[in-house]
């Protein structure tokens, strides 16, 4: 599965957990596909979070190339997990 499938996996498990961390990488190619996948995945994750009232840390990185992806992936998962924990601790 790719980043586009993350929302459906979260949706299927939404009642099992208090929060989620979505991790993935979308690297821009030569077609508009990147824009469609990036936006639709982000929108779906946000809607799941709002509708379920559960935090979903968005650790899906969008980059122009693999080099950027490697750099951004070093901290993005930790940041997304910390965001989820912060919401769970404060609400």
What are these language model-derived features?
Residues 1-4, 62:
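Short beta->alpha junction loops
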Residues 5-44:
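Glycine-rich phosphate-binding loop
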Residues 8, 71, 86:
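Charged/polar, solvent-exposed surface patches and flexible loops
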Residues 15, 46, 50-54, 85-90:
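Generic secondary-structure signature for well-ordered alpha-helical cores
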Residues 22-26, 57-64:
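Glycine- and acidic-rich phosphate- and metal-coordinating loops
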Residues 35-62:
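Short, acidic/small-residue loops that bind anionic groups at enzyme active sites
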Residues 64-75:
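Phosphate-binding/catalytic loops
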Residues 75-91:
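A charged, well-structured terminal subsegment
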């Amino acid at each position: 599965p790719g980043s586009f499938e993350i929302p459906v996996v979260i949706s299927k498990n939404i009642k099992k957990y208090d929060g989620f961390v979505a991790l993935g990488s979308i690297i821009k190619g030569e077609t508009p596909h990147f824009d469609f996948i990036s936006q639709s995945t982000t929108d779906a994750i946000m809607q799941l979070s709002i509708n379920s009232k559960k935090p979903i840390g968005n650790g899906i990185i969008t980059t122009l190339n693999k080099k950027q992806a490697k750099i951004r992936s070093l901290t993005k998962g930790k940041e997304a997990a910390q965001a989820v924990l912060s919401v769970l601790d404060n609400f």
